[in-house]
Amino acid sequence: MNNNTEKPSLLDRLRPNLIWIIFATLGWYMFIAAFGHFAWEGMMDAIKDHISPAMFFTLDMYAATIVDVITLFILCWFFKKNRYIWKSFMIKPASSGYAAGDILTEDDAYADLYGRRRNSFKMLGIGLLLGFLTNFFCIICALLHGDIKLYFDCAASQIPYFLFSLVCVCIQSSSEEMWCRGFMYERLHERYPLWVAVVVNGVLFGLLHIFNPGVSAIPIIGIIITGLSYSLLRWYCGNIWIAMGIHTGWNFTQNFLFGLPNSGLVSEASVFHLDAANAVSSIIYDWEFGVEGGIPALFIDALLGAIILYMAIKDGKIRELGMNRLQTLEAHGLKMRVEEAEPVAEAAPAEVVEEVHEDAAEKAEDVDSTTAE
């Protein structure tokens, strides 16, 4: 008896593995993005003497991450299987919805359920407000504890610069969210229960900051908790824009509004300025790493995650943490088909099968009549 079944290659056997997903993603990012950042640094060296130090900082530390967004775009569109991830970053107008009875591809169904149908500027705004409030809470704690002193020094002529900086910070924060709470999160959720995507995502997010200036154990633990909380927020709210917003609001508030270190990096210009000579470290504030090196930041992010879990338990959504992508879609009662096609109304599967059987029967009758003759 001939067995034509081919054994899966070593590459095929590795692909479902958690380690493969992680290292393949990081490898692609480092290989492709490295060329882009090399070119960006060359451009920055060429214009360094023609722009202010503040503008150089904004372009070099924040706007440069546009390279990471482009790298992710290439990854999502070069490999067709990843395109649904990029779709989940977009906004889908209400007028482009599907008709009743449509059967979607699994990718389109997921992109709609957790992405483009729920992404909105409203969610981005809510995220920005959350980012400001959570960071402001940590700054107030540091001020009341006497760890820092701030003074106001901002001219009206600087407002355009700060608005431009907000856009650049949004690019930087969104690029991290798109890679972590977007690509990595989605690829893990495709094969594993959601809790695996949340946990791995949070840990990797923390490890990505281990080379930041002034880093220590508490900031890394805090950033891991931040990654966990932002992953839960992205899941519970059903869109990534709110995560982009809270990340942007946090970074912009501490770096450009209050002039504090953002993960160890200090802006050249801000609305308020830190009296660095009198800043001290404590359990509330780290003079090198900023409020992210204190207990309040760890507490506020843990509280955010706890609130999300409480709300998920209360409305019964918590069960999704134990489901992979396909199981989640089935739990929501979405009809799916495997092949790619335009999202238009189709005949029911049973009718399609019946038509196929009728065609086969007609062909069989033609063959029988020909044989008889």
Model regions: which residues?
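C-terminal membrane module of polytopic membrane proteins
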Residues: 253-373
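Functionally important transmembrane alpha-helices
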Residues: 30-41, 219-283
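Membrane-embedded alpha-helical segments of multi-pass membrane proteins
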Residues: 62-71, 159-166, 179, 220-228, ...
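Membrane-helix interface linkers and caps
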Residues: 2-11, 32-126, 132, 141-153, ...
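Hydrophobic core of alpha-helical transmembrane segments in multi-pass integral membrane proteins
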Residues: 25-33, 68-77, 131-139, 298-313
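Membrane-interface helix/loop boundary segments of multi-pass membrane proteins
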Residues: 175-200, 232-239
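Small-polar-interrupted transmembrane alpha-helices in polytopic inner-membrane proteins
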Residues: 135-136, 169, 193-210, 223-224
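Membrane-interface helix caps and helix-loop-helix hairpins in membrane proteins
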Residues: 147-152, 209-217
